[in-house]
Amino acid sequence: MVVYKSLKPLAFKSKDMNHLPVFWRANNKAWVTAQIFSDWFTNCFIPQVEMYLKLKNLPFKALLLIDNAPGHPTSLKFQHSDIEVMFMPPNTTSLLQPLDQGVIAAFKAYYVRRTFQRLLKNLEEDPELTVTQGWKNYDIAKCLVNIKESLDEVQPSTINACWQKLWPEVVLKSDKIDNLNTTVNQIVEIARNVKGFDEVNRDDIEEMMLNYDQELTLEDLEEITETPNEPKQSEHDEEEEEPVKPDFSSKSIKEIFH
């Protein structure tokens, strides 16, 4: 699921929004609220799980394990008789949640690598293109392509190994998690070929990926419920941004990807 600030950005002007590679929703803060998460549960999770189980000739019974984030409503526990929804204990996400045991880290690494690869390719194909223009050309449509391709790159062994702490009996080999060191090294090598990133190092990349995760707090949700929550229908409605002087030092690499 991807939550954006606009229901139909300019980059999707000629696209069918029902055939995007992600479950697409929007609000003016680009936050996953309880309403959006319930929408995902009903219109994405349930149909896809049902389709998968039919392909495997399995009965429609499923378990959804989620953390206690403010945007995850407890009412989901009673929404479908064939799906059991369980919430993890508070403050255990980083320790137990399967996605936090290697899957998210692998996805982030693949996404960052593909982003730098795309930028470098564009610069090589058009010598007159500046790095600033290259970043500006990276719109939400290209972002979704990267998201889909990065998710597809996550190996089944990585997904299997993520259950090591909660369900070790089903893990085939706990050492099968993707070699992130290799991927991070590849990112550094690619980034250093881009003008302005020649001083990027492993610490910059690893810190950037660690800072991706910022869960909503209760205060965040209170703010979004107290202010108008309707997403922009189109990016035509957005105010024109003032030009920002580009900073491509290693210290600014995190901000570029946020």
Task: Locate predicted features.
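Acidic, serine/proline-rich intrinsically disordered regulatory segments
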Residues: 2-258
